[in-house]
Amino acid sequence: IYIPYFVYKTLVLWKLRLDSSAMITHRGRIEYRGNGLNDNVLLYVHGSPGGYDQTTDPGKNYSVLTPSRPGYLGTDILSGSSPEAQAACFKALIDELKLDKVFVMGVSGGGPSAMHFAAQYPQNTSGLILFEAVSYSENFLEKDEALINARDIDLFIQLSFMTCFGSKKLAASMLPNKNNRARLLANKRNIRLLKKVIWSIWPISRRRSGIKNDYNQFIN
């Protein structure tokens, strides 16, 4: 298993570098993905853990801009640890990209910084969308500690098994809200996208600073 694993990891890390762009702002270097940005831009704020690769597809009438939040992949944690500071990073990025207004979507652990962006910069916010967003503080769970401290190879094996689950079990493991699970299961394409999202937490070693910071921000 070790040789295929190391080959796969090398390819993943190479692709992560290849598929992203970076902008030097007054908040530091911010990694992002956003091609063909137009007048209708969705600022997609990824969850915990995640990165610019945890995103959604552009639509017919809108493009998608996904930054890596501080501590994830190519954005240094020093750019901003609190949700307020991360919102300031997003503001710095859209200013450099000459974007006046964006729709903001906060997913999971990206919810707090998305909400702060909308509150702090209403002049730059066309709308706010929240999906399974963190909206209150809570303490670590045992499974959270295990994820934060996981080795890349152990998580690789775990995710490989997870993506072999039946659709219902897989959805239940990822989405607490029953209505959201039902909508996801109604479309086979959604299951394929969910499996893609699951792998966007790997390799965890490139996202560990971000998830540790998130939990420090979110716990009681």
Q: Model features per residue range: what roles?
A:
Residues I1-S21:
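N-terminal membrane-anchoring alpha-helices
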Residues T25-N35:
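A short loop-to-beta-strand scaffold at the N-terminal edge of the catalytic core in hydrolase folds
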Residues G34-G74:
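Conserved HGGG/HGGXW glycine-rich cap/lid loop of the alpha/beta-hydrolase fold
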Residues S82-A87, G111:
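Conserved donor sugar-nucleotide recognition element shared by glycan-biosynthetic enzymes
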Residues A85-F103:
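Conserved acidic catalytic loop of the alpha/beta-hydrolase fold
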Residues D100-F140:
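Conserved hydrolase catalytic core segment
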Residues L128-L159:
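Flexible "cap/lid" loop of the alpha/beta hydrolase fold
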Residues I148-A150, F156-N220:
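Alpha/beta-hydrolase
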